[in-house]
């Protein structure tokens, strides 16, 4: 019977375009009808970067962009959830349509462009859950027209420091022109230095040290992975999230939509992101936490992520929220 309801629900959502379906799923969670909590099983619990997660499956950024339903997502059983990407000022993102289903590939292409309501709106919503349990991270980004993009990331750290359990620095979206250039070593060195300095200053004032993770692209060459690993290690970054969406279209079967610009996610991202996860583990050694994202849709794919990235410490993994099920 549950399979029937799942099929009917999926068909109903597919009657709308992808972005409308996403909005409807958020609206459904906002009704407050979701009950429950993450499983309280010590066998599933994992400690990473000083945080005790009830289980290692989390909701990646990109679904709850504006911090509208973090607690509803935690009630669904996720061990953590990540809001954003949030930029200092609101921005509308790229023109619609900007999400394209590739049904035969169990994937989508999106070129949203960090559409979000900005720091103020997210801060107000997160303030309303102050004191509640559950790990909610904040994924921070830069406005498209920012003169100093690194300053936007620093602003995100300072604004949300009291409310975020951890931060993700997103420099890997392909939908903001020039953003991925921050992954180059010289730019990355300055970015991490300024962001971690802000984190350390805020931490001293409230005696709390929030972990900072870096989210990278799956399209990096080995030399670029070398540079990122070196900077992350040298600056004592808390962890790396692997990966964002890909620009590759290799092996796609779907005819419609495959030529649209934007980042590809879903099942076709799984192999590429998992390979990069394994390569990064080789570079950073056994101790740095790595978080695997991309194409996770089953226990088997989740376990593969863990095997690729978890040598001596467990890896966290998050479902790729741009895949067509369930949100789109």
From Swiss-Prot:
Substrate binds at residues 65, 110-114, 170-175, 244-245. Its cofactor is FMN. Binds 1 FMN per subunit. The keyword Mitochondrion applies. FMN binds at residues 61-65, 85, 139, 170, 215, 243, 266, 295. Keywords: Flavoprotein, FMN, Membrane, Mitochondrion, Mitochondrion inner membrane, Oxidoreductase, Pyrimidine biosynthesis, Transit peptide, Transmembrane, Transmembrane helix. This is Dihydroorotate dehydrogenase (quinone), mitochondrial. Belongs to the dihydroorotate dehydrogenase family. Type 2 subfamily. Pathway: Pyrimidine metabolism; UMP biosynthesis via de novo pathway; orotate from (S)-dihydroorotate (quinone route): step 1/1. It is a single-pass membrane protein. The active site is at 173 (nucleophile). Its EC number is 1.3.5.2. One of its GO terms (biological process) is 'de novo' UMP biosynthetic process. Catalyzes the conversion of dihydroorotate to orotate with quinone as electron acceptor. GO terms for molecular function: dihydroorotate dehydrogenase (quinone) activity. SUPFAM superfamilies: FMN-linked oxidoreductases. NCBIfam families: PRK05286.1-2, PRK05286.2-5, pyrD_sub2. It is found in: Mitochondrion inner membrane. It catalyses: (S)-dihydroorotate + a quinone = orotate + a quinol. It comes from Cyclocybe aegerita (Black poplar mushroom). The chain crosses the membrane at residues 21-38. One of its GO terms (cellular component) is mitochondrial inner membrane.
């Amino acid at each position: 019977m549950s399979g029937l309801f799942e099929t009917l629900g999926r068909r109903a959502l597919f009657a709308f375009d992808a972005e409308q379906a996403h909005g409807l799923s958020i609206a459904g969670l906002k009704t407050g009808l979701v009950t429950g909590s993450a499983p309280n099983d010590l066998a599933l619990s994992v400690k990473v970067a000083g945080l005790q997660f009830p289980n290692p499956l989390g909701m990646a950024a990109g679904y709850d962009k504006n911090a509208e339903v973090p607690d509803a997502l935690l009630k669904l059983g996720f061990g953590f959830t990540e809001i954003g990407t949030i930029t200092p000022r609101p921005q509308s993102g790229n023109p619609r349509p900007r999400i394209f289903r590739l049904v035969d590939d169990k994937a989508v292409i999106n070129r949203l462009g960090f559409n979000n309501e900005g720091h103020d709106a997210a801060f107000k919503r997160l303030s309303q859950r102050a004191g509640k349990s559950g790990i909610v991270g904040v994924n921070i980004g830069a406005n498209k027209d920012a003169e100093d993009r690194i300053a936007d990331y620093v602003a995100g750290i300072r604004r949300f420091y009291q409310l975020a359990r951890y931060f993700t620095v997103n420099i890997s979206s392909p939908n903001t022109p020039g953003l991925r250039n921050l992954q180059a070593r010289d730019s990355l060195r300055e970015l991490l230095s300024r962001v971690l300095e802000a984190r350390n200053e805020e931490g001293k004032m409230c005696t709390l040290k929030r972990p900072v993770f870096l989210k990278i692209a799956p399209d990096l060459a080995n030399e670029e992975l070398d540079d990122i690993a070196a900077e992350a290690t040298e600056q004592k970054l808390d962890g790396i999230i692997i990966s964002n969406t890909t620009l590759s279209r290799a092996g796609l079967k779907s005819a419609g939509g495959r030529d649209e610009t934007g980042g590809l996610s879903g099942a076709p991202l799984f192999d590429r992101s998992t390979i990069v996860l394994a390569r990064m583990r080789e570079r950073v050694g056994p101790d740095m936490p790595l978080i695997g994202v991309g194409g996770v849709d089953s226990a088997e794919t989740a376990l593969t992520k863990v095997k690729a990235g978890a040598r001596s410490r467990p890896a966290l993994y998050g479902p790729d929220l741009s895949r067509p099920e369930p949100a789109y």
